[in-house]
A protein has these predicted regions:
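Amphipathic, small/basic residue-rich leader segments at the start of a protein or domain
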Residues: 1-102, 119-129
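Short N-terminal helix-initiation segments at or just after the protein's N-terminus
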Residues: 48-52, 104-114, 135-137
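Glycine-rich, Trp-frequent "lid" loop and neighboring beta-strands that shape
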Residues: 118-177
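Short, surface-exposed, polar/charged, turn-prone segments marking secondary-structure boundaries
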Residues: 90-93, 114, 164-167
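N-terminal glycine-rich flavin-associated loop
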Residues: 95-120, 145-148
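Generic alpha-helical propensity signal that fires on short helical segments
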Residues: 26, 78, 104, 108, ...
Length: 177
């Protein structure tokens, strides 16, 4: 046991160990045998279905999705650290897969915390129903790039997209590149 292990909860250690076996038994053998797929630019040629299905089987694809929708909730006070521990372990096998799962987790938290019940039902339903469904989000602007990490009102932020509340909803004006 390392010093780092002593700061993890028992659940985090268990989840990390499950992910470690997943990487050793599934991800690394696939990468070793199919390293040339890294250069296949077609979506269907990259990550085989069974990898996401296996990530679903060990319970990491739907982390952060409320249990009432069929997901796996985490203790709020440990959620971010749990995501970090698991993503680090997955990235040991394939950083691209880790990034895909991190996007699921980030968007799940945003939906859970900010979306209407209707949107939660719609999008969590899609994620739970289809083991190959992945969430994504778009954050950059022509002048903003990584400014998304700054506070929304930071004077040095170059993000131009604005949202304005109007009768019946919101109007969002901005530009993606």
């Amino acid at each position: 046991m390392t010093i780092f292990d002593k700061s993890l909860t028992n659940d985090q250690i268990m989840m990390r160990d499950v992910c470690r076996r997943f990487v050793d038994d599934v991800i690394q053998p696939f990468i070793s045998q199919n390293w040339q797929k890294e250069w296949d630019l077609t979506p269907e040629g990259r990550l085989p279905d069974n990898i996401l299905i296996e990530s679903e089987a060990i319970g990491i694809r739907t982390l952060g999705v409320p249990e009432r929708f069929g997901g796996i909730s985490l203790e709020p006070e440990n959620e971010v650290r749990t995501f970090a521990v698991i993503s680090e372990e997955i990235a040991r096998g394939d950083s691209g897969l880790a990034d895909k799962l991190v996007q699921n987790w980030k968007v799940s938290v945003l939906l859970r915390e900010l979306a209407s019940e209707e949107h939660q039902e719609r999008w969590f339903g899609k994620l739970i129903e289809d083991p190959n469904f992945l969430f994504a989000h778009a954050l950059t602007e022509p002048k903003g790039a990584s400014d998304r990490w700054l506070g929304y009102n930071a004077p040095s932020a170059a993000m131009d997209t604005k949202a304005k509340k109007v009768d019946g909803g919101w109007v969002i004006n901005g530009r993606k590149h």
